[in-house]
């Protein structure tokens, strides 16, 4: 493997896990060479670097990392400012658990909507709508999601919320005022806007923001 002089990210233009990492890179202001990859037809370069040929894959000189949360935590340690995880172990662990729960519950529903039968997809749309409405008070408790500072948890939550209209999930604004306020705050953040691929920008126009 050739040593690269600049950090390289193999990213899917519509891949939600790649989007997480792109937000972190933008938040940290890291110069990175982004290679857009079709996950169904990975390049030989990616296959050589990552035996699973999964996205995202990060190359930093001799280091190759895959799995979004591994990459995000590496970037947070490699570039400590601004910090995207709390200092104290208990708070850090809570953030990690939140990321796990968002992915296990909501990302799982997204996958079924995209790949399941029409009946399965509709069930998951109803589930996501109901869960987000019930979660609305939590969105209003802190400036960001369950924290006064922007964290990796927001880097996991934001890509999902961005994709809701594309997934056919329409949460009534009156039933989720705090969530819509949170979305507006996040979607207007410079790092989030910079993280969007051209394909992601085209996913949505306006969603009551």
From Swiss-Prot:
<dbReference type="InterPro" id="IPR004046">
    <property type="entry name" value="GST_C"/>
</dbReference>
<dbReference type="InterPro" id="IPR010987">
    <property type="entry name" value="Glutathione-S-Trfase_C-like"/>
</dbReference>
<dbReference type="Pfam" id="PF00043">
    <property type="entry name" value="GST_C"/>
</dbReference>
<comment type="similarity">
    <text>Belongs to the GST superfamily. HSP26 family.</text>
</comment>
<dbReference type="GO" id="GO:0005737">
    <property type="term" value="C:cytoplasm"/>
</dbReference>
<feature type="domain" description="GST N-terminal">
    <location>
        <begin position="5"/>
        <end position="83"/>
    </location>
</feature>
<comment type="function">
    <text>Forms an equimolar complex with the RNA polymerase holoenzyme (RNAP) but not with the core enzyme.</text>
</comment>
<dbReference type="InterPro" id="IPR004045">
    <property type="entry name" value="Glutathione_S-Trfase_N"/>
</dbReference>
<protein>
    <recommendedName>
        <fullName>Stringent starvation protein A homolog</fullName>
    </recommendedName>
</protein>
<dbReference type="InterPro" id="IPR050983">
    <property type="entry name" value="GST_Omega/HSP26"/>
</dbReference>
<dbReference type="InterPro" id="IPR036249">
    <property type="entry name" value="Thioredoxin-like_sf"/>
</dbReference>
<dbReference type="InterPro" id="IPR034341">
    <property type="entry name" value="SspA_N"/>
</dbReference>
<dbReference type="InterPro" id="IPR040079">
    <property type="entry name" value="Glutathione_S-Trfase"/>
</dbReference>
<feature type="domain" description="GST C-terminal">
    <location>
        <begin position="88"/>
        <end position="203"/>
    </location>
</feature>
<dbReference type="InterPro" id="IPR036282">
    <property type="entry name" value="Glutathione-S-Trfase_C_sf"/>
</dbReference>
<dbReference type="Pfam" id="PF02798">
    <property type="entry name" value="GST_N"/>
</dbReference>
């Amino acid at each position: 493997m050739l040593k690269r002089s600049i950090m390289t990210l193999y990213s899917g233009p519509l891949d939600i896990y790649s989007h997480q990492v792109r937000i972190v890179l933008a938040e940290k202001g890291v110069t990175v060479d982004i290679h857009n990859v079709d996950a169904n037809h990975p390049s030989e370069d990616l296959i050589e670097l990552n035996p699973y040929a999964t996205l995202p894959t990060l190359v930093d000189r001799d280091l190759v990392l895959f799995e979004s949360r591994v990459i995000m935590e590496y970037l947070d340690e490699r570039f400590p400012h601004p910090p995207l995880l709390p200092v104290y172990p208990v708070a850090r662990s809570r953030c990690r658990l939140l990321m796990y729960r968002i992915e296990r519950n909501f990302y799982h529903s997204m996958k079924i909507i995209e790949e399941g039968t029409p009946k399965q997809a509709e069930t998951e749309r109803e589930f996501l709508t109901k869960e987000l409405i019930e979660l609305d008070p939590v969105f209003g408790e802190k400036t960001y999601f369950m924290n006064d500072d922007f964290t990796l948890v927001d880097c996991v939550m934001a890509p999902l919320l961005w994709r809701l209209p594309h997934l056919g999930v329409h949460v009534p604004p009156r039933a989720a005022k705090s969530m819509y306020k949170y979305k507006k705050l996040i979607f207007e953040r410079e790092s989030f806007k910079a993280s969007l691929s051209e394909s992601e920008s085209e996913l949505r126009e306006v969603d009551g923001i």
